[in-house]
């Protein structure tokens, strides 16, 4: 049989068209495919087809991103207002309720309080899963062993946070919590190869400045109380006591000591949890369920060992005249923790991470103001200035992290294009 020889004449190839698309090459490819030695052409065709599929997938992904951006821009205001308000209300409510619970006269059973809150939180999450509102992993012993160190760190975080709230005003507590962000950022630099941008560093200076202003205002108020012989805060119970019962140094230092420990514990908790999440693959509700469930026995054991379970201690911590209301507030605070987790996830899902960061930064202002409104914290130039500077530092930090995320995303996109 005579072999097929393609014609050497062909139409003019348009400028920019690959020679692969010419008539001669296509005919040659057909000939190679029909001959025993045409395997190379088949491989070439397969490679080209795979490249086309990859390009189509990248185009679809890019179209999806652009569509999501357009939907987010065109999203009605009423759609985003509700999750933002829910997150803000949950944060304020949780802080105010916890401050109310631990501010009772001579309240010393903090571990028992936290155990009750964790139990209520687990019950609410389990009930929400049963009725189909949320979903998370079932109990697994291997997951529990891997996550137990994280839960132990969480116990330290919530205990030191409660003690800080017991001795510090809400504005001072809220402002000093910003220092945790600095510790976490430099922890990521050391252990995860992160970096701090100049704008992020500027926000850190503002955070430190707001903390110094808040501490100066708080110490000035305490010194003025001491000089006037007015009641001050007892470092053991957190209650107001006469001047003669307490020393000046204890008054000023104990709250800041608890706050410093809380910042260290919070940073360690976040950094260690980041490592463990990679091992366990936990989602938000998984970590919340295991955190609270595993912390219950730890809190209960510490309560039995450290705290006084005598009848006199119970009547002092849970006075009979307000016992029902106090226990209801404790249970409510446990349920509020679930509400915070849900509203946070809702806000991120509907509004995006950027909006959530800005809302979280601005939300420090009403949280700090709630202490002035509900607990009579002093309104003076120092407190107001510290709150405003702290709010600005949070906004600058949110903008810095957003810009950093955009730069990293563009680098990843360029890296993907170069590989393709």
Swiss-Prot record:
Bilayer-crossing regions: 77-97, 107-127, 146-168, 172-194, 201-223, 252-272, 294-314, 324-344, 356-376, 379-399
Subunit comment: Homooligomer.
Biased composition (Polar residues): 1-11
Lumenal side: 98-106, 169-171, 224-251, 315-323, 377-378
Ranges per topology, Cytoplasmic: 1-76, 128-145, 195-200, 273-293, 345-355, 400-420
GO CC, alphabetical: cytoplasmic vesicle membrane; endoplasmic reticulum membrane; Golgi apparatus; Golgi membrane
Membrane topology: Multi-pass membrane protein
Keyword field contains Transmembrane: yes
Region (Disordered): 1-21
Family, per entry: Belongs to the TPT transporter family. SLC35D subfamily.
Primary site of residence: Golgi
Keywords: Cytoplasmic vesicle, Endoplasmic reticulum, Golgi apparatus, Membrane, Sugar transport, Transmembrane, Transmembrane helix, Transport
GO biological process: GDP-mannose transmembrane transport
Protein known as: GDP-mannose transporter 2
Sample GO molecular function, one term: antiporter activity
Location of the protein in the cell: Golgi apparatus membrane; Cytoplasmic vesicle membrane; Endoplasmic reticulum membrane
Keyword Transmembrane helix among record annotations: yes
Protein function: Involved in the import of GDP-mannose from the cytoplasm into the Golgi lumen.
A Pfam family recorded for this sequence: UAA
PANTHER family reported in the protein's UniProt record: SOLUTE CARRIER FAMILY 35 (PTHR11132)
């Amino acid at each position: 049989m005579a072999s097929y020889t393609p014609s050497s004449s062909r139409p003019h190839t348009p400028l920019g068209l690959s020679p692969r698309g010419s008539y001669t090459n296509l005919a040659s490819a057909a000939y190679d495919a029909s001959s025993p030695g045409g395997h190379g052409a088949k491989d070439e065709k397969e490679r080209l087809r795979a490249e086309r599929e990859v390009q189509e997938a990248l185009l679809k992904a890019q179209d999806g991103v652009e569509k999501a951006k357009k939907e987010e821009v065109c999203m009605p205001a009423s759609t985003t207002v509700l999750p933002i308000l829910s997150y803000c209300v949950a944060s304020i409510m949780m802080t105010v309720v916890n401050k109310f619970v631990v501010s009772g006269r001579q309240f010393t059973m903090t571990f028992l309080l936290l155990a009750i809150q964790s139990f209520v939180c687990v019950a609410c999450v389990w009930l929400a899963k049963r009725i189909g509102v949320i979903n998370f992993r079932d109990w697994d012993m291997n997951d529990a062993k891997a996550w137990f160190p994280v839960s132990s760190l969480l116990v330290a975080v919530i205990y030191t946070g409660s003690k800080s709230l017991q001795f510090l005003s809400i504005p001072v507590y809220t402002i000093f919590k910003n220092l945790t962000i600095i510790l976490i950022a430099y922890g990521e630099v050391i252990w995860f190869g992160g970096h701090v941008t100049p704008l992020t560093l500027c926000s850190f200076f503002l955070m430190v400045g707001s903390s110094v202003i808040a501490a100066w205002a708080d110490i000035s108020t305490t010194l003025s109380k001491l000089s006037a012989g007015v009641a001050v805060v007892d470092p053991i119970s957190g209650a107001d006591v006469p001047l003669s019962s307490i020393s000046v140094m204890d008054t000023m230092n104990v709250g800041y000591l608890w706050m410093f420990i809380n910042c260290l514990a919070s940073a360690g908790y976040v950094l260690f949890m980041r490592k463990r999440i990679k091992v366990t693959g936990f989602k938000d509700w998984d970590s919340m369920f295991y955190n609270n469930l595993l912390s219950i026995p730890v809190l209960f054991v510490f309560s039995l060992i450290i705290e006084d379970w005598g009848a006199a201690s119970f009547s002092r911590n849970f006075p009979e005249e307000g016992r029902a209301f106090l226990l209801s507030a404790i249970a409510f605070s446990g349920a509020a923790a679930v509400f915070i987790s849900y509203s946070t996830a809702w806000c991120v899902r509907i509004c995006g991470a950027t909006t959530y960061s800005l809302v979280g930064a601005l939300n420090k202002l009403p949280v700090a103001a709630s202490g002035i409104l509900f607990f009579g914290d002093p309104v003076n130039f120092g407190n107001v200035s510290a709150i405003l500077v702290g709010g600005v530092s949070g906004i600058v930090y949110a903008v810095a992290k957003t810009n950093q995320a955009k730069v990293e995303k563009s680098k990843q996109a360029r890296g993907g294009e170069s590989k393709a």
